[in-house]
Design a protein with these regions (language model features):
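Feature marking well-ordered beta-strand scaffolds used for ligand recognition
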Residues: 1-176
Length: 176
């Protein structure tokens, strides 16, 4: 199956950007797809019959990124809006809900999200010289709480490196 940008309501001046996968508890597969105006949820269980389930509007932006934890998706953009929290609990029934936006004392611009699904921490980077921001999504996934910040300099990307040995030079269970 082939979906075009106009299928997502994106005009010729718009774009598609990042994507991420989600598998529902029933085993159905979904693509979370960023467009210049929204985060789309597309069922791809049968790739020959992909269908748009929902679109969550966001600020117009060249870049949008998304990640998941439990049955929640988190979406950000370089256009602002903080972290959009999207509930996918009923996605198989075609119900996708924007729970809210997480705003803190930073601008809402973000380039990249990384989620460590083992520790339950979300890392937000690449936004207007705001450094790297850390959020707890384990305690209350619907309302991530900022628990840390590293630097006020620009950080473009992040990755999670879990440590599995006590002989590590680091005194933390993970690094970014």
């Amino acid at each position: 199956s082939w979906l075009t940008l106009p299928d997502f309501g994106v005009n010729a001046a718009g774009n598609g950007n990042s994507c991420f996968g989600y598998t529902s508890p029933s085993g159905r597969e979904y693509a979370l797809f960023g467009t210049s105006t929204s985060t789309a949820v597309v069922e791809v269980t049968n790739p020959g019959d992909a269908r748009i389930v929902a679109q969550i509007p966001g600020p117009v932006s060249l870049w949008r990124d998304m990640r998941t934890y439990s049955h929640y998706a988190y979406a950000v953009s370089e256009g602002g809006s903080g972290i959009q929290v999207i509930d996918l609990a009923n996605v198989d029934a075609g119900v996708v809900t924007l729970v809210g936006n997480v705003h803190d004392d930073f601008f809402g611009q973000t380039h990249t999200l990384v989620v460590d699904t083992q520790s339950g921490y979300l890392y937000r980077s690449g936004g207007a010289g705001q450094g790297l921001r850390m959020y707890d999504v384990h305690t209350n996934p619907a309302q991530p709480a900022r628990v840390g910040t590293w630097s006020d300099r620009y950080v473009h990307e992040a990755t999670i490196v879990p440590f599995t040995t006590e002989r590590s030079l680091w005194h933390t269970p993970e690094a970014w």
